[in-house]
Amino acid sequence: MIYQMQMPAKIEVDEATHTEMFGRFIAQPLERGYGVTIGNVMRRVLLASLPGTAITGVKIEGVYHEFSAIEGVREDVPEIVLNLKRVRFKSNCKRSCKTSLSIAGTKDFTAGDIIAKEGEFEVLNKDLHIATVNDGSVLNIEIYIGRGRGYLPAEENHPEGMPIGFIAIDAIFTPIRNVKFTVENTRVGQRTDYEKMILDVETDGSIAPDDSISLAGKIINDHIMYFANFSPTEEEFTEEEFKQQDDEFESMRKLLHTKIEDLDLSVRSHNCLRLAEIDTIGDLVSRKEDELLNYKNFGKKSLTELKEQLEKFDLKFGMDITRYQMK
């Protein structure tokens, strides 16, 4: 007789505490020991592996190193950098962008003054204080914003070709503020040694708590599937078969890097994708249908047109293309 492990019927949501930035999720019943196992891996992935947007660097006019004082500004550069690290964004763009600001007169410079071009991003904590500019002074500043996962220290955050005076900033990309879990005993029938795992997730508002645990679960599943599909008697491939696999992989990778403008699309669809910063087929297939429909001027007619184009290449929306190292 095969022993069936006890599995949760579903993940419950504590509606009484649920907000746009906080979620409490309950998984029960679990076999003994699985509460800690699942809680630990979910916590680690939520904190370290979810993508987010952060300020990666700054250039301030008249400043050439990060330990400077700025004439006419109350805060020195280290204080301004610390404040900029705390700015949180909601962003649809996949690549880095830059915005320039000129703060003049007696002004309290806050995160809300950081304005995106063409709606590339939205500042969530607009009231966050950045600096105070004194009367008669001007603060000219360029802010570099990028996408990433987890945390990236400043020393690893200095791309080539940056202008003189560029100051790299420790980038806190993770959209998760805090994660904690607790494990309690729960009863199934006469047995009381099953477990209930309670997972608390707090986000910065750029992602809903529900979406964050769903994405974390997908990341975990994508890794576990290699173990689930593992066979101790792996097939032996000939050199020709290995070459065929490499060729197929490279062919798909090349296809995903193909520019959108190379597709036979209407002007309307092409303009919608350009405004959404969808530049390649890889950018397109990684999006879900409902995500595309949220873009300005993008309707079902455009969606149908794109579907027909993707079907020609045996592609579809919502594909996981991470193995092809799309950048």
Curated annotation (Swiss-Prot):
EC number(s) recorded for this UniProt protein: 2.7.7.6
Transmembrane segments: none
Start and end residues of each stretch annotated as Alpha C-terminal domain (alpha-CTD): 247-327
Listed InterPro entries: DNA-dir_RNA_pol_insert, DNA-dir_RNA_pol_RpoA/D/Rpb3, DNA-dir_RpoA, RBP11-like, RNAP_asu_C, RNApol_insert_sf
Keywords, alphabetical: DNA-directed RNA polymerase, Nucleotidyltransferase, Transcription, Transferase
Highest taxon of the lineage: Bacteria
Nucleotidyltransferase in keyword set: yes
GO biological process: DNA-templated transcription
Swiss-Prot/TrEMBL catalytic activity: RNA(n) + a ribonucleoside 5'-triphosphate = RNA(n+1) + diphosphate
Region called Alpha N-terminal domain (alpha-NTD), residue ranges: 1-231
Note on domains (UniProt): The N-terminal domain is essential for RNAP assembly and basal transcription, whereas the C-terminal domain is involved in interaction with transcriptional regulators and with upstream promoter elements.
Xref: NCBIfam families: PRK05182.1-2, PRK05182.2-5, rpoA
The name this protein goes by in its record: DNA-directed RNA polymerase subunit alpha
